[in-house]
Amino acid sequence: IHLVLLLLAFTLVAWIAARYDRPAARNLLGHYFDSPLPAVIQSVVLVYRPPLLDILPLYILLVAITPLVMAAARRTGWPSVLAVSAVVWLAAQFGLRSALHGALHLPIALNLMGSFDLFAWQLLWVGGLWFGTSGLPMLQSRPERLRGLLHAAAMLAALMLAYRHLAGPHGWMDSATRQFWLDKWSLSPLRILNIAAITGTLMLVGPAIASRLRALLRPFEILGRASLWVFTAHLASLLLLLCVVGSDDRLLDGAAGLAAAAAGFAAVFVASAL
């Protein structure tokens, strides 16, 4: 799937960007326009990861390490695996990725290797593996403790939602502090806390909502079951949309914006039905 998206980007999207002067698409593929052959080779081996095309490589790499994680969990237990994952995540918060890039002298700029920090995001993946295989059954075996944790998670989620909308995107912080606590690319501490709080909230209220709104939620259930294909269709739609947008700062509004949104939604629902 990733190779198909790369093919779309490096052929049709690149041709339209060059032929019809589409800066948004050209800037997305800047490294490819500067060095076509190295960019193609580097992208195939998941080193060069242009914006929008840097999420599937992350997914591929995390899937690749899953057998190793599961084997380590069976051999040493989940506590040690989670501890190692947490230490790697903590090191990522203090620049592990950039330090390794400098030490290895890689022939590609760090900003061309994708926005998402693998060393940070692996914690979410490993945590999900633990939760699905061991964590959730363990919590369900202790319903009193689980109930208390879920109510605490719901309160925390409400507080963080209020903080986000009262403090705004800057969060009452200077840029350096905000980078450490709220950065999305390195899955910063408050991001981890927020994900845990939302997960607990959904566990608390999700079953009741699903039972009452099952018919309304059915389309989203279908999207979730075909999430990989839905995401692929979404990315392809975005790449093609960049061929329509004339510049980075031009917004589609009015009829053009509605048409683009309708086409995007249609693409993901068609993909989920295939």
Regions found by a protein language model. Give the residues of each.
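Alpha-helical transmembrane segments and their immediate juxtamembrane cytosolic regions
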Residues: 1-274
